[in-house]
C-alpha cells in the first residue's frame, strides 16, 4: 500500500465557533492549496470534521505534500497516510495489518486508534484486534509506554486512515484571520523571527527595510525577505518596502547629541512606518525588540520611542532571550541568512539605557520634520531575487 493522502490537523481553529471557524477553515484550505501548488504537488484539498484531507493524485508526492502542508500557519501536525474503505471491523483490521505488517516485523509496537461517526465497535476494539493480527504476523511484542513503533489508525465513517508518523506544523492561525501589519525588518535574527511570529497569529505581514547605505546589509535583507515569503507566506502576497534612510541618518548624526541618536532614529523609523502602514491599510507595526537586550531596548527607551503612536506596536520577542530567538530562526529556515547580516545602526554611539524623557523630546524636535523619500516597493512572490537586487543596483 502506498500513501495516497495527507491528514492535516489543526487545534486552535477547532475551539472557534460558527462563522469564525468556517472562515478560518476556508483560509486554511486556500493557504494549503497555494503551498501545495508551489511545491509542484497535484492534489485536492478536502475539509473533514476537525481535519483537512489532502488527496494526492500521485502517491509519490506524499513526502512533498507533507512538507508543504507543515509550512502553513494554522496547521498543528500532518501525517502521510493510506486511505481505505472497509465493510466492518474485521475487514478494517485485515487492511490495517496488510499496511503495518512488514513495518512492525520484529519490532515492539503499540496501536493507537481513533474513531468518529462510527457505531458498532470502539477504538479499543480496533486496537485489540489489530494488535492480535500484527503479533501473528511477526511483530516483536507490545509495549504501550515505550514502543519502537506506533501504528496509528483513524476511522471516519466508512473510511479509515493508516499512518505511522506525526510531523509538527507551526500551529497558530491561518494567515488572513487577522488584519495586515508592517514589520520593521533588518534581515537579522530578531526582526525575521518577529515577523514570522505575527504571521503565525494570522496577520499578513509586510516588510519595511530601512536602508542606511550598506549594500551588504540590503542584499542580505532582501534574501531573507524572499526566503520568509517563499517558505511561509501562503494565502497572500507580501510586499517589501525599501526606505532610503541614509539622509535621515546623516542629519541625525549632525544635529542630535550622541547619546540620543539611536533612539531618535528609532522613533523616526516608527513614525515613518506608521504613516506608510496607514497609507497601505496595515493596522499594526511589528518590531523585533527584546526587553533589555541592548541599551535602546530598555523599558524606558521603548516607551520613549513609541510614545504617542496611533498604531499598536507588536513586540512578540519582548520576553525572549537571544539564544531562544536564534534557535527559532534556525527552526524556521532563516538562520543561515540572518547570521550573515552585518550590524548597521546608522549612528556612531550607543544610547543611554536610561535616557531622559525631556532630553529625548528636545533632541527629537531637531529632526522631526526631515524629508524621507518614498520607498521602493517589491512583490516578494511575484519578483525574483535577482530582479529585486538588480532594481536596487546590487546586480548587473
Swiss-Prot record:
The keyword Protein transport does not apply. ATP binds at residues 184-185, 266, 288, 297. Pfam families: ThiI, ThiI_fer, THUMP. Transmembrane segments: none annotated. One of its GO terms (cellular component) is cytosol. SMART domains: THUMP (SM00981). It is found in: Cytoplasm. PANTHER family: TRNA SULFURTRANSFERASE. This is Probable tRNA sulfurtransferase. It comes from the Archaea. It comes from Aeropyrum pernix (strain ATCC 700893 / DSM 11879 / JCM 9820 / NBRC 100138 / K1). Catalyzes the ATP-dependent transfer of a sulfur to tRNA to produce 4-thiouridine in position 8 of tRNAs, which functions as a near-UV photosensor. Also catalyzes the transfer of sulfur to the sulfur carrier protein ThiS, forming ThiS-thiocarboxylate. This is a step in the synthesis of thiazole, in the thiamine biosynthesis pathway. The sulfur is donated as persulfide by IscS. Pathway: Cofactor biosynthesis; thiamine diphosphate biosynthesis. HAMAP family: ThiI. The keyword tRNA-binding applies. It is an enzyme of class 2 (transferase). GO terms for molecular function: ATP binding; CCA tRNA nucleotidyltransferase activity; tRNA binding; tRNA-uracil-4 sulfurtransferase activity. GO terms for biological process: thiamine biosynthetic process; thiamine diphosphate biosynthetic process; thiazole biosynthetic process; tRNA 4-thiouridine biosynthesis. It catalyses: [ThiI sulfur-carrier protein]-S-sulfanyl-L-cysteine + a uridine in tRNA + 2 reduced [2Fe-2S]-[ferredoxin] + ATP + H(+) = [ThiI sulfur-carrier protein]-L-cysteine + a 4-thiouridine in tRNA + 2 oxidized [2Fe-2S]-[ferredoxin] + AMP + diphosphate; [ThiS sulfur-carrier protein]-C-terminal Gly-Gly-AMP + S-sulfanyl-L-cysteinyl-[cysteine desulfurase] + AH2 = [ThiS sulfur-carrier protein]-C-terminal-Gly-aminoethanethioate + L-cysteinyl-[cysteine desulfurase] + A + AMP + 2 H(+). Its EC number is 2.8.1.4. Its main location: cytoplasm. The gene is thiI. Belongs to the ThiI family. Residues 63-166 form the THUMP domain. Keywords: ATP-binding, Cytoplasm, Nucleotide-binding, RNA-binding, Thiamine biosynthesis, Transferase, tRNA-binding.
